[in-house]
Amino acid sequence: SCMKAAPMKEVSLRGQGNLAYPGLRTQANLENLGGPNDATRGLTSLADTFEQVIEELLDEQQAIQPSKENKDADLYSSRVMLSSQVPLEPPLLFLLEEYKNYLDAANMSMRVRRHSDPARRGELSVCESTSEWVTAAEKKTAVDMSGATVTVLEKVPVPKGQLKQYFYETKCSSKGYTKEGCRGIDKRYWNSQCRTTQSYVRALTMDNKKRVGWRFIRIDTSC
């Protein structure tokens, strides 16, 4: 049971925080995990610690991204991966961005946001979407930031061979409310439609003059 698993004196993240997450204070609040009588307080502190780790990871990511003075900086996405095989999970930075977007959309404290998670309240999305990894062989071409159509190269040369380019795309689900309108919108008074929207990611491409280079291209990223 939870009460039996609650004592966490043996669980110590001291000395491990900098190894797993450089610069993060993962040991914060773990001193309060005292024993069975402190089970509720201990688990709450642990949850707060995980939230703190996520927030600090986001801060670290923002620190290494281009300056916000660059108008294209906010168009960059972490949905591209170079790999020898199909990735099994969504990219970590993508998950962090999704979490950050959810936090930004809710103007409330983190603890209130956690307890108001839509998944806990049984809420449904206005538009259904699906996400999956696709290869350059499936994309073939894309539109770059200048509006030109470029060829997306399937493989990227590396010192020990070649790696494939994978793109994590999100689009409206064919089983969703794309044609019938958005969920929750009164059709008697409003017309609505779910549409797939795009963002820019950086990929290795070739233009119509056979010039190969890294360019920002548009891929499906939301519904």
From Swiss-Prot:
Residues 1-5 form the signal peptide. One of its GO terms (cellular component) is synaptic vesicle. One of its GO terms (biological process) is negative regulation of neuron apoptotic process. GO terms for molecular function: growth factor activity; nerve growth factor receptor binding. The keyword Disulfide bond applies. Pfam families: NGF. InterPro entries: Brain-der_neurotrophic_factor, Cystine-knot_cytokine, Nerve_growth_factor-like, Nerve_growth_factor-rel, Nerve_growth_factor_CS. PANTHER family: BRAIN-DERIVED NEUROTROPHIC FACTOR (PTHR11589:SF3), NERVE GROWTH FACTOR NGF -RELATED (PTHR11589). Promotes the survival of neuronal populations that are all located either in the central nervous system or directly connected to it. This is Neurotrophic factor BDNF precursor form. It comes from Ramphotyphlops sp. (strain YPM 13663). The gene is BDNF.
